[in-house]
Structure formats: structure tokens, C-alpha cells
């Protein structure tokens, strides 16, 4: 149906820059910022109105995490980790974490590492991702593109098994701050900033077939 949004409930605190992922029955937020870095994982039950509930914690206080999920496992990738309470002074995370969404609650566990630098402001030797597009099938999770220096690189993981991200292919252009969404078979990246010239806003929509490499 069409119509305006209706109030569902509240987060435990005012939060910006949190990651989000979901199963068929639960929605999750991970990390965020206000007034400092957060490591909370919270969840709501879609079928009931009300506020969010505490699920567990991430290994680091992090904002800007890229998140995705299949039907059972939620994945938390990258982000900017706490070094002090300035949101732009943190280090860049290459870590991938996971939770089992149907559990009664648990802290995130280590899954693997991302491939390469992907966040605005990275310097040589830093790794992480904050601004790529994410999408998933029942078996694979993908993060595409990312920050400065902007990249075309698309990375993937196999959600059911632990391990580092692997190279999937490339976008048609370098892109950061990209929106990602998917069906069970096809992942799309939309908009963002590209390098034609530097920091040009984009209206480009690209797609990949998630089950293939390329």
C-alpha cells in the first residue's frame, strides 16, 4: 500500500551513521555515533511495534559500518573505529564481523578482513571501507566501490563460511558514497560520487549478477 510512515518506536539513544541489516523477522542496527562512537547492536521485531532491544556488542566502537545479511547471519564490515570522540579522528577498520540473527543475543564474532583502502581520507597502509554499496544473496555478500582514493573494486564473501573478502570484479567507474540494494540474484549500485571530474555527483545505476564473478 501507499501512505505515510507510522511511528514504530525508538532506539536506545539518538544515533547517526549506524549500519543496518535484517532477517525476515528482525531488523538490526550496528554501531553509530552520538555523542561518541558506539559498539551497540540493537534489534527490533518487525511484527510488533515498540523500541529496539539490546542484542550484543561489536568488537570495536565504530560508526559507518557497511552491513548485509542472508536469512540467518548478519555481516558487519569496516567502518571507522574509536580513537577519540571526534567522529573524523578514528582509524579505518578492515574487519568483518558476524552475528547469528535468530539467537537470543550475542556479541559479534570475527569473520575475516576486507581487501583494500576504501574510505575517504585514507593514507597509505590503512585499510577499511565506509562508503561502498552493499548487497547480498542467500550465499554471498558484496561491497562495491568506496572512498578516497575512490575505487572500482568489488569484493565478496561467502556468508556461511568465515574468511577474508575476495575480488569479485569492478564497477564501471570509481565511486564512493554509493547506495546498494539487491534481489536474491542481482545487486545494484546507485549514485554516489565519481572521479569525472573529482567529486562529481553521479546518477549512474550499475548491476552485477551476484552468483557470478565479473
Locate the predicted segments by residue.
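Polar, enzyme-active/binding microenvironments
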Residues: 1-214
Amino acid at each position: 500500500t501507499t501512505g505515510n510512515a507510522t511511528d514504530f518506536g525508538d532506539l536506545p539513544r539518538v544515533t547517526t551513521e549506524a549500519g543496518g541489516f535484517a532477517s525476515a523477522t528482525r531488523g538490526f542496527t550496528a554501531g553509530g555515533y552520538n555523542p561518541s562512537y558506539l559498539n551497540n547492536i540493537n534489534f527490533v521485531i518487525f511484527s510488533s511495534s515498540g523500541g529496539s532491544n539490546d542484542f550484543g556488542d561489536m568488537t570495536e566502537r565504530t560508526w559507518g559500518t557497511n552491513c548485509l545479511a542472508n536469512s540467518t547471519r548478519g555481516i558487519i564490515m569496516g567502518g571507522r573505529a574509536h580513537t577519540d570522540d571526534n567522529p573524523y579522528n578514528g582509524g579505518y577498520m578492515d574487519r568483518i564481523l558476524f552475528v547469528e540473527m535468530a539467537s537470543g543475543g550475542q556479541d559479534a564474532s570475527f569473520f575475516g578482513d576486507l581487501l583494500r583502502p576504501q574510505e575517504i581520507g585514507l593514507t597509505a597502509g590503512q585499510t577499511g571501507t565506509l562508503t561502498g554499496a552493499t548487497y547480498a544473496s542467500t550465499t554471498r555478500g558484496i561491497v562495491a566501490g568506496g572512498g578516497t582514493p575512490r575505487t572500482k573494486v568489488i569484493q565478496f564473501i561467502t556468508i556461511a563460511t568465515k574468511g577474508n573478502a575476495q575480488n569479485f570484479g569492478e564497477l564501471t567507474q570509481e565511486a564512493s558514497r554509493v547506495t546498494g540494494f539487491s534481489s536474491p540474484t542481482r545487486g545494484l549500485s546507485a549514485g554516489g560520487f565519481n572521479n569525472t571530474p573529482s567529486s562529481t555527483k553521479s546518477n549512474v545505476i550499475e548491476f552485477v549478477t551476484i552468483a557470478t564473478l565479473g
